[in-house]
């Protein structure tokens, strides 16, 4: 696309510290990302916007032109919320007064909670456990993704994560999702049985790491991610 048509520049450092890649978005691609994400999320929360708590700091969305996968996630999911509140102060500690006020205000409603997995774990779950605090959020739905490598280093798997979340909040409606900044909008969301699902707008193929031929179900290999969204950059097919 022409430089004048670029409305957003997204950056990704990769999962293993590779050099930063830049993804340039024009208005059409940015719009498609939102439309597709909205279609996917409607299957889980309906079309009505919910009161929303983000387990992060407000400063994460300060730069609207250049932002990371974390920023893109917060901005993308926040369109499904209303009266959006941030749970953490700038020093990454829980603002209990703000959080309790939010929960009390919407105690009779369904609440949408969003955050990145490792941030939720380190700065919300562990902190609540440390101070012995619990919330009754049984009517809430939690979406989270990213940061699993850091949790695996602490021997925390998906089951342990969900159990500990449930213990401090009574949340049972928890959905992990997989996405990458190179294909923002094309997320794969975990169902209630623990399986990730491809939407009508994306797909994935497991390929042999030597021959690159497609593998049978249940096999391990390289992941080829496919998406119909990108218009302003070559992100339709990515091998990861």
Predicted regions and their residues:
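Active-site glycine/GP-rich loop and adjacent strand/helix microenvironment
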Residues: 75-240
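A generic structural signal for short coil/turn motifs at secondary-structure boundaries
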Residues: 20-23, 62-63, 150-154
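Flexible, low-complexity linker/hinge segments
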Residues: 1-6, 36-39
């Amino acid at each position: 696309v022409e430089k004048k048509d670029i409305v957003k520049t997204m950056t990704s450092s990769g999962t293993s510290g590779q050099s930063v890649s830049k993804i340039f978005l024009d208005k059409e691609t940015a719009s498609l990302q939102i439309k597709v994400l909205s279609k996917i999320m409607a299957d889980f929360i309906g079309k009505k916007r919910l009161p929303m708590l983000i387990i992060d700091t407000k400063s994460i969305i300060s730069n609207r032109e250049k932002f990371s996968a974390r920023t893109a996630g917060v901005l993308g999911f926040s369109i499904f919320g209303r009266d959006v509140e941030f749970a953490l102060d700038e020093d990454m500690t829980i603002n209990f007064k703000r959080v309790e006020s939010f929960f009390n205000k919407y105690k009779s409603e369904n609440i949408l909670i969003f955050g990145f997995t490792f941030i939720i774990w380190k700065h919300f779950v562990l902190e609540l456990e440390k101070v012995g605090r619990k919330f009754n959020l049984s009517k809430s739905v939690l979406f989270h993704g990213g940061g699993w490598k850091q949790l695996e280093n602490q021997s925390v798997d998906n089951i342990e994560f969900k159990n500990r979340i449930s213990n401090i909040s009574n949340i049972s409606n928890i959905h992990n999702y997989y996405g990458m900044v190179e294909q923002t909008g094309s997320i794969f969301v975990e169902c209630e049985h623990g399986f990730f699902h491809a939407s009508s707008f994306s797909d994935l193929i497991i390929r042999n790491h030597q021959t690159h031929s497609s593998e049978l179900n249940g096999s391990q290999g390289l992941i080829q991610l496919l998406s119909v969204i990108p218009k302003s950059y070559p992100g339709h097919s990515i091998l990861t």
